[in-house]
């Protein structure tokens, strides 16, 4: 969610909205928790959540993200596509809420993403989710728990071939948690 060039966020929002209107012409963007979505439609809404965030519309991004997450949970689908979207969305919501300084809520969504990942077969994002949890804990002044998570995460990331991510965690650890023991 954090990777964008900042250029055409508004245009991206418009294009994603237009794409969704192709299959859901009468969708009410103020309340779609009761809608049923195909994996493609759900993916468009997940991307729209990210686009709103990148455009600085955090509250809209949170609202849309929470509604699509509710709709996906309500569908009880066994399709792995839906589980992947739920994991991505819960993780994205945790990042947006963290940026808003709403750390308790951010931690709840990060833990939801963690649980969905662990309980399912989709663990590809788990290291990034664990890093997010550690960052949230650091922001909540739970530095020792944050440090322990990061110190365990770095060798694991290197082991599974996520060296760049491990370097990022190491850099964050050195910058934010060096010589900090509370």
Residue ranges of predicted features:
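Residue register of alpha-helical TPR repeats
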Residues: 36, 43, 81-84, 88, ...
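TPR-repeat structural position
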Residues: 9-10, 58, 103, 143
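Amphipathic alpha-helical segments of tetratricopeptide repeats
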Residues: 17-30, 66-78, 111-122, 152-162
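Structural motif corresponding to the intra-repeat A-B loop/turn of tetratricopeptide repeats
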Residues: 6-7, 55, 100, 133, ...
């Amino acid at each position: 969610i954090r990777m964008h060039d900042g250029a055409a966020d508004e245009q991206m929002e418009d294009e994603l909205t237009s794409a969704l209107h192709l299959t859901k012409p009468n969708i009410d963007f103020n309340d779609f928790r009761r809608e049923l979505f195909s994996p493609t439609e759900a993916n468009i809404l997940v991307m729209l959540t990210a686009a709103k965030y990148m455009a600085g519309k955090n509250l809209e991004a949170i609202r849309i993200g929470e509604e699509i997450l509710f709709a996906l949970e309500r569908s009880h689908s066994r399709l792995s596509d839906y589980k992947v979207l739920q994991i991505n969305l819960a993780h994205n919501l945790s990042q947006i809420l963290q940026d808003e300084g709403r750390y308790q809520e951010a931690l709840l969504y990060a833990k939801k993403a963690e649980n969905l990942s662990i309980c399912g077969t989709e663990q590809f994002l788990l290291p990034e989710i664990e890093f997010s949890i550690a960052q949230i804990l650091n922001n909540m002044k739970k530095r020792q728990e944050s440090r322990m998570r990061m110190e365990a995460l770095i060798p694991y990331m290197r082991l599974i071939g996520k060296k760049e991510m491990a370097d990022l965690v190491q850099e964050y650890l050195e910058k934010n948690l060096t010589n900090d023991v509370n």
